[in-house]
From Swiss-Prot:
InterPro entries: dsRBD_dom, RNase_III, RNase_III_dom, RNase_III_sf. This is Ribonuclease 3. It comes from Syntrophobacter fumaroxidans (strain DSM 10017 / MPOB). Keywords: Cytoplasm, Endonuclease, Hydrolase, Magnesium, Metal-binding, mRNA processing, Nuclease, RNA-binding, rRNA processing, rRNA-binding, tRNA processing. Homodimer. Gene3D superfamilies: 3.30.160.20, Ribonuclease III domain (1.10.1520.10). PROSITE patterns: DS_RBD (PS50137), RNASE_3_1 (PS00517), RNASE_3_2 (PS50142). One of its GO terms (biological process) is regulation of gene expression.
Length: 242
């Protein structure tokens, strides 16, 4: 199947029919394709990806607030991070067979671009942005609710709650890799107390910057405490990558 073929099948899986299929086409154009075809007067999907990230975050936040009105900001942020991450976006992209529709350069194709998690996740965000531009907010909310149904149906809320069982370090790593393409590092700040009753203070560092600190009776507990604080800081938009 050619990448440009089968768009009707993709629209059927999405449960959405484009009024302007040009927007759908643009969502599938990777920059590598245009680099190798400079004569084409087209745009790649990177700006759509930027918009799609914001649209998806808004939609999931909206649905979680509806679903769990009694949850506090920290709990909602943890749920959103458990849902909106590269792993889950890639899973949905694979279910849509999205990789087969992408327009890639030959080099990207040869290195397995159609199966790359980051590329698939980014392309899904671009696809959601194209739906938003084509049909508006209500249209994209409907598609996102369909695609993320396993998390968002009330009777299936245990799937979302199960995500809360993830340790904070795992959640933080997934979030920072998805948002910043970086992996957090944990550094011992200091130890206090006698050998039989030590308290460890750990810092979580991102790109050379201390993001947060935490304490515990073991290094592992201190790392978890630091990761929890880091998640809260990122959720509150109180940190930026300089």
């Amino acid at each position: 199947m050619k990448p440009s073929d089968g768009l009707e099948a993709l629209q059927n899986l999405l449960g959405y029919r484009f009024g302007d299929e040009g927007l759908l086409h643009r969502a599938l154009v990777h920059r590598s394709y245009l680099h190798e075809n400079p004569h084409l007067d087209e745009k790649d999907n990177e700006t759509l990806e930027f918009l799609g990230d914001a649209v998806l975050g808004l939609a999931i936040s909206h649905f979680l607030l509806e679903q769990f009105p009694d949850y506090n900001e920290g709990e909602l942020s943890r749920l959103r991070s458990a849902i909106v991450n590269e792993r889950e976006l890639t899973r949905i992209a694979v279910e849509l067979n999205l990789g087969e529709y992408l327009l890639l350069g030959k080099g990207e194709e040869m290195t397995g671009g159609r199966r790359k998690a980051s590329l698939l996740a980014d392309s899904l965000e671009a696809l959601l942005a194209s739906i938003y531009l084509d049909g508006g907010l209500d249209a994209v909310l409907g598609v996102i609710k369909k695609l993320f149904d396993v998390y968002l149906r009330f009777e299936k809320r245990e799937h979302v709650l199960k995500a809360l069982d993830k340790d904070y370090k795992t959640q933080l790593q997934e979030l920072t890799q998805a948002r910043y393409k970086l992996t957090p590092v944990y550094v011992l700040d200091r130890e206090e107390g006698p050998d039989h009753d030590k308290t460890f203070h750990m810092n979580v560092v991102l790109e050379g910057q201390v993001l947060a600190g935490g304490s515990g009776k073991s290094k592992k507990d201190a790392q978890q405490a630091a990761a929890e604080k880091a998640l809260q800081i990122i959720a509150a938009d109180s940190w930026s990558l300089d």
